[in-house]
C-alpha cells in the first residue's frame, strides 16, 4: 500500500475539500496540512463510486504511507472520522479504512496497530473493534504478543473464532494457552505478572461469552464451505482442551456455580448438537450440508421438536428444504443415514408437484433430475406421474411431458 485514501465527498460522515483547504498551505502544486506547525504533505485527488448503478465522482486525499499516522492524528484531533460502517456509507469512506487496517494487520505494521489500539478515539469510531479481530485473523505471533495488552478480554470468543477460521495451530496454541491462564486466574483470584489481555468491566461474564454454541455458530456463518468441516473438528478439539484445563482447579467457593456454568458451555453435548442443527436448518436453509451430516453423525436428533403445538420437527424442516429447493444433496444425507422412509419419499414427490416451476427449461432439467433421483431412491413415481403430466401439459412443456411418458412406460 503506497497511499491511504481519505474521502472528501462532503456527505453525512465526510468533510469537504473546502473544509480541509482551510488547514492547508500550498507550495505550487504541493499541499500541506498545517497541524500545529507540523506540515503533513497530502495530495488531492478524485475517485469513482458505484452506488447500485448510480455513478459518482468524489474528492479525496491521498496520503503517503509514512505520513498516515500524522494525518490521522490531525483527523482525530478535529474529530473528522465517524463510526466505521460500510453498510451506512454512500461513499468509500469505511472501505478505505478497512483496506488500510487489513494491510497493517496482514503486514504486521506494529507501530500503526499500537497507535490506534492505544488511542481511545479509535474505540469510539470502531476502528479498534475491527483491528482487534483482524489481528488474530492476519497478524503473526510476534505482533499478537506485542498487542495482547490492548485486546479486551471480553472479546475472547471473537478472537477464538478468527483463529479457528485462520487454522494456524501456532496462533491457536498461543491463544488457547492464554485463555486457560486467564480462566485459572479468574476463578482462583491469583495474580499474573506476564503478558495478558486487557481486563474490562465485562470480564466476569466470560461464562456467557465463551461457549461452544456461539463459537461454532460463528464458524458456520463465516467459514468458507471447503474449510468448514476442518474448523468444526478443530473447534471441538479446542473446547475439549479448554474443558480439561478446568479440571482440578481450586475454584473459590463463591465462584463454583459460575465455573460449573463455564464448563457446561465448553461441553459438546446433545443439547449443543441439536442447537447447531436447528440453527443450520432454520437460519441457513440447510447449509453447510457437510456440517448437517456431521452433526447427525455426532448424535444430533433430527426429530427434535421446533413447534410443540404442531409437532413440527427438524426432520419436517429438512423435508421442507428438500422440496422447496429440490435439494438432492440433503436428500442424499437422509438416505445415507437411513433417516428417510418410503412414505416420506412419496410425500416429497407428491408435495413437489405443487412446487415445480415447469415454465422454464432450466427448471425442467432440474425437475427431471429431481424426479429421477426420487424414483431411484424408491419413490412411487407411477402413483403421481399422471398429475405431473397434467401440469406439464398445462404449461406446454413438451420436453417434460415426453420424459414423464417414457418414465411411465
UniProtKB/Swiss-Prot annotation:
Top-rank lineage group of the source organism: Viruses
To which protein family does this belong?
Answer: Belongs to the mimivirus L17x/L18x family.
| Protein name as annotated | Uncharacterized protein R34
